[in-house]
């Protein structure tokens, strides 16, 4: 059996077992999902979902985040860990989205990864969940499961992303990643 055949079997098995493939982060708009995803680094989605209601209530728009005092954001996101960097990045992201992208969260990897604190994992999540583009969100869970299934033989997130893009049907790639988590 080829890796591509194995990947298709995995897609079908996971689809049958987990028909609802959704992101566990709670967000009402693309920028909120971008913020929640940044907070999720080295933190559980459950913890992020406890923090974001107060954060989004205090800063309901991208402009509000852009004008926020980083120290105030730090206080709200403290329990997510790495709060100095995360707060700085969130305020920086808001400023960049406003000034460079006219208040619209970018829809491509290159522009997304140019934002403070946004790597390929976050960029792929936004491209897939917000814009419906084929995306592989190579987090630790997907990397571990893909290795166990024999789809990849690497722990490098970028290599996993590229290899899985070749194996997974584009229309299934984003959901496959959610189902693995």
Name these PLM-found stretches.
Residues 2-181:
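Catalytic cores of DNA base-excision repair glycosylases
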């Amino acid at each position: 059996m080829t890796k591509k055949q194995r990947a298709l079997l995995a897609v079908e098995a996971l689809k049958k077992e987990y028909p609802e493939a959704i992101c566990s982060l709670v967000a009402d708009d693309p920028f909120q999902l971008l913020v929640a995803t940044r907070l999720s680094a080295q933190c559980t989605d459950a913890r992020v979902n406890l923090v974001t209601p107060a954060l989004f209530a205090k800063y309901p728009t991208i402009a509000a985040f852009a004008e926020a005092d980083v120290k105030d954001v730090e206080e709200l996101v403290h329990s997510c860990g790495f709060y100095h960097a995360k707060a700085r990045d969130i305020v920086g992201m808001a400023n960049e989205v406003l000034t460079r992208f006219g208040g619209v969260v970018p829809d491509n990897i290159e522009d997304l990864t140019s934002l403070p604190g946004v790597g390929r994992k976050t960029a792929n999540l936004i491209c897939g969940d917000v814009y419906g583009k084929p995306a592989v969100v190579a987090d630790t869970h997907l990397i571990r499961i893909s290795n166990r299934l024999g789809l990849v033989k690497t722990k490098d997130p970028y290599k996993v992303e590229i290899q899985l893009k070749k194996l997974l049907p584009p229309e299934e790639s984003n959901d496959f990643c959610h189902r693995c988590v």
